[in-house]
Amino acid sequence: MSGNKQIKHIMFKHIVMWRFIEGANGKSKQQHALWVKEHLEALVGVVPEIRSLEVGVNVCVAGTAYDAVLVSAFDDADAMERYKVHPAHVEVAAYFKGITEGRAEADYNI
């Protein structure tokens, strides 16, 4: 058995979590999270690089919790970069300006 085994990555995962500002633009954190869920999930079938995408809205009352999480998959990091600049994604991403107080991101190969 060779110790020089090469691992083939089959997918690239992109995870993002947001904390929204209560009352920003006249909406609650829950309203922001639901808007984000609806509009990001609507990108499936519009942005061809997306292999899978789901947005979860937080149900935990812990003060350290984030309000929404995006779990998305792409063929590779290059595909994710194309997704980020796709006009439909850029339009949705503009919504986040001025409504977030925290954001965390993790990207990895599987």
Predicted regions, residues:
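C-terminal structural segments of small proteins and small subunits
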Residues: 74-99
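Short S/T/G/P-rich N-terminal loop/turn motif that feeds into the first structured element of a domain
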Residues: 2-67, 75-82, 109-110
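Interfacial aromatic-anchored transmembrane helix boundaries in multi-pass membrane proteins
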Residues: 101-103
